[in-house]
Structures are given as C-alpha cells and as structure tokens.
Swiss-Prot record:
SUPFAM superfamilies in UniProt: Ribosomal protein S7
Family: Belongs to the universal ribosomal protein uS7 family.
Protein name: Small ribosomal subunit protein uS7
GO MF term set: rRNA binding; structural constituent of ribosome; tRNA binding
C-alpha cells in the first residue's frame, strides 16, 4: 500500500464575476458533461435574479443560505457486535460546505419552476429565509443525530 498520504488539495480558480470561492464551487457542482459556460450562465442568472428580488448583494445572500443549509452534525453507521448503530458525529467544515452545495443543487433540480436558473434562485432565496427543501434536509439530519445521541459514545 502506498504511504504518501492524501493528495494535496488543488487551489480553486475564483470565478471572474464575483471572485468568490463559494460561487466557483457552486458552478462546479452544477456542471454537467463539462459544459462550464452553461453552468456559469445558470449560476450568474440565479444570482442576478436573487439581487433583483432581495435588493442586496447576491453573494451575501448565497453565504447566508449556505449557513442555513450547512449541517453541524450527521450520523454515520457503525457496526458493533451484530448490530449497526447510527452514531452522531460532528461534520468538518469542508464536508459541511460540500453537503450544503449538494443539497442546494439537488433540491433546486427537484423544484417545479421552468428553468434551472429560476429553480436555483428560488431555492437560494428560500434557504436565505430559513425555508425550502435544503434547509428541511439539514433539520432532518440534525433530528436524526439528536435521536441517536445515546450512541454518541461509539464515536471513533
């Protein structure tokens, strides 16, 4: 087995419009089949729509939405004896951001609006206000961790 350790993280190229690493990560998460310009058009359109609807800085709205979506706890399966327990563990910051982006994009795709730009804009605005499916997913994750608090001593 190789003993070099994990590969170093590659630096993130910031997006040209907002210069925000979060916007870059969102673009990369929406990216399908390598069509970066399409992904950029969707994200920038959604952020412009968010600016028009909320009247504020769209990147600040996205950051607020991400804070409302990011989980602080999750459950991981742990096998002890013959039983499998759902053990609550804290979520590392990088994973919390990745999960939040995954949920934001996933629940945006599931919405009923006509274009992906509209769906993403409305999901961001809903999450900003503490509403929406992505925020509900975070609450469900926290509820699950709270319900399995008795197994917290199985942490590793």
């Amino acid at each position: 087995m190789p003993r070099k350790g994990p590969a170093p993280k590659r630096p993130l190229v910031l997006d040209p419009v907002y210069g925000s690493p979060l916007v870059t990560q969102l673009i990369n998460k929406i990216l399908v089949d390598g069509k970066k310009s399409t992904a950029e058009r969707i994200v920038y359109g959604a952020l412009e729509g968010a600016r028009e609807k909320s009247g504020g800085d769209p990147v600040a709205a996205l950051k607020k939405a991400m804070e409302n979506i990011k989980p602080s706890l999750e459950v991981k399966s742990r096998r002890v004896g013959g039983a499998t327990y759902q053990v609550p563990v804290e979520v590392k910051p990088g994973r919390a951001t990745a999960l939040a982006l995954r949920w934001l994009v996933g629940y945006s795709k599931a919405r009923r609006e006509k274009t992906m730009t509209e769906r993403l804009r409305n999901e961001i605005l809903d999450a900003c206000n503490g509403l929406g499916a992505a925020v509900k997913r975070r609450e469900d994750t926290h509820k699950m961790a709270e319900a399995n608090r008795a197994f917290a001593h199985y942490r590793w």
